[in-house]
């Protein structure tokens, strides 16, 4: 199936590893991504805080371009881009607003192509069951993960129309399909501080620190997310969160596509693990250690049962 792919600006810069791992995973799973030709910025956070009409026009331009493509949907990995694209479609349901938006565009947007996140496509169009069937050896067994969705992936629910906006589980199920253990993370939709990382680093340090502290306390080896800004605040700014908390955090923060790529044994250079600030080796080593311990326990149990059977046989 063909999808119009909107990578977003961060995918070309600060989160290039998210883009490359997304493309690699989709290719491996038979999802055909067609880049929207001449795509442009959706406006991100600044546009909609200044002018809703401008914000919708910026997003609608990309939707109009996608309408000329033979695709099932427009998909994007970035929750911020997703919000702007879906909000534009939602607002343009009002005819008067739609006319105003299209007056700003060379090509009017007709709202004929649905918009989804890449996560939604993997969760619904492919499904965790199909992923599990592809990987019967459960390659991420032993890895404990805290799935973090952030505050906009599923909100507002009437616009996003995907998963539960208070307790989403799409990423949880995909990680479990890979064999990972998902810890019961109660802060999965709490804010990490978002773009306050520029103006108020103290707020980001406090909010991100709370997330990291909770994940660590639950025994997670790593956090897994679907949002470039969340990943940046939890990973790149982890040192600032540590300083604010008076405790050194050492939790790798993966994109979920990187972990799916690892499970699929895709080439390392396509996953961009080297771009993570907190070394992923910390989590992967913990995973291997936990797996070895489970194997040792199983072997000891089998040995004890064999000894018990031998003892019974001798007694008889």
Regions found by a protein language model. Name each.
Residues 1-316:
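Iron-sulfur cluster-binding electron-transfer modules in prokaryotic oxidoreductases
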């Amino acid at each position: 199936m063909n999808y119009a792919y909107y990578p977003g600006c961060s995918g070309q810069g600060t989160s290039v590893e998210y883009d490359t791992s997304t493309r690699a995973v989709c290719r491996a799973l038979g999802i055909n991504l067609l880049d929207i030709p001449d795509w442009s910025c959706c406006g991100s956070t600044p546009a909609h805080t200044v002018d809703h009409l401008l914000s919708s026009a910026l997003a609608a331009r990309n939707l109009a371009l996608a309408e000329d493509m033979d695709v099932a949907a427009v998909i994007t990995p970035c929750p911020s881009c997703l919000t702007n694209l879906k909000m534009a479609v939602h607002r343009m349901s009002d005819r008067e607003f739609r006319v105003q938006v299209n007056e700003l565009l060379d090509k009017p947007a007709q709202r004929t192509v649905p918009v989804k996140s890449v996560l939604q496509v993997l969760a619904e169009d492919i499904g965790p069951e199909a992923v599990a069937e592809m990987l019967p050896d459960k390659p991420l067994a032993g890895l404990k993960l805290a799935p973090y969705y952030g505050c906009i992936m599923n909100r507002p629910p009437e616009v996003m129309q995907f998963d539960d906006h208070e307790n989403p589980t799409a990423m949880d199920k995909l990680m479990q399909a890979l064999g990972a253990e998902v810890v019961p993370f109660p802060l999965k939709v709490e804010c990490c501080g978002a773009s306050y990382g520029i103006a108020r680093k103290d707020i980001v340090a406090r909010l991100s620190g709370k997330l990291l502290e909770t994940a660590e306390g639950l025994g997670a080896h790593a956090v897994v997310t679907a949002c470039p800004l969340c990943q940046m605040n939890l990973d790149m700014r982890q040192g600032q969160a540590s300083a604010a908390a008076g405790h050194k955090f050492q939790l790798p923060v993966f994109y979920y596509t990187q972990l799916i790529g690892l499970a699929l044994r895709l080439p390392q250079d396509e996953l961009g693990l080297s771009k993570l600030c907190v070394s992923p080796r910390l989590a992967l080593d913990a995973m291997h250690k936990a797996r070895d311990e489970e194997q040792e326990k199983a072997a000891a149990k089998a040995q004890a049962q064999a000894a018990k059977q031998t003892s019974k046989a001798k007694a008889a």
